[in-house]
């Protein structure tokens, strides 16, 4: 590439116009955004569901009617300046219409939907601008829009929630370098350890 200054560059100049352009362990991030696509179980072409200059973060959780999914995203205009901030959104698969389900300062992510489609388990925290904050396990009632924290008594970061029927949530947390799997009722209460020392 000729520079006009009598110097020839081996590689083209990289123009960066985004706040988030590089990540530890990944290097320069490719341009573009992460979006949801669907493919028929019969096969065929993928169809894009979400659009715009925002990332829609995996995993997405299907509702039982297969008409919508719940996913974490930051759809604010200044999303690049709030890298931790995500909310849960319900997205209509046919229209791409979004409905915000959570709203707080801090990340909400990793949704898991109950088999009856009435509740969503997820993890996140109220961002107090600290160096590290534990992710709390919460459950959202889709009809009322209210959320309740289920792991407030646990001084560990809850991750990977999965519904155990409609009555309980199974999740994991790291404890002294080892993974523990635990279970808590959807209505709250004591956390019961299911397995420890999982690596």
Question: Where do the protein language model's features map onto the residues?
Answer:
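A flexible loop/linker signature enriched in serine peptidases of the S9 family
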Residues: 1-35, 50-57, 72-87, 100-112, ...
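Structured loop/turn residues at beta-strand edges in well-structured enzyme cores
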Residues: 31, 44, 64, 115, ...
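Short loop/turn segments that connect beta-strands within beta-propeller blades
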Residues: 40-44, 92-96, 141-145, 185-189
């Amino acid at each position: 590439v000729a520079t006009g200054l009598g110097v020839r560059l081996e590689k083209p100049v990289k123009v960066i116009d985004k706040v988030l352009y590089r990540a530890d362990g990944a290097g320069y991030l490719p341009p573009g955004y992460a979006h949801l696509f669907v493919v028929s179980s019969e096969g065929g072409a993928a169809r894009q569901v979400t659009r715009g200059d925002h990332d829609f973060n995996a995993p997405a959780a299907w509702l039982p009617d297969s008409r919508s999914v719940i996913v974490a995203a930051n759809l604010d205009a200044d999303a690049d300046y709030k890298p931790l901030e995500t909310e849960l959104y319900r997205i209509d698969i046919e229209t791409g219409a979004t409905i915000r389900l959570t709203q707080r300062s801090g990340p909400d992510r990793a949704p898991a939907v109950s088999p009856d489609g009435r509740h969503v388990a997820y993890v996140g925290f109220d961002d107090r601008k600290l160096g590290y904050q534990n992710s709390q396990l919460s459950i959202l009632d889709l009809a009322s829009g209210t959320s309740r924290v289920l792991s407030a008594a646990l001084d560990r970061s809850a991750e990977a929630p999965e519904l155990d029927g409609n009555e309980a949530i199974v999740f994991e947390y790291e404890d002294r370098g080892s993974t523990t799997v635990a279970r808590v009722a959807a209505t709250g209460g004591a956390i019961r350890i299911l397995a420890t020392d999982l690596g």
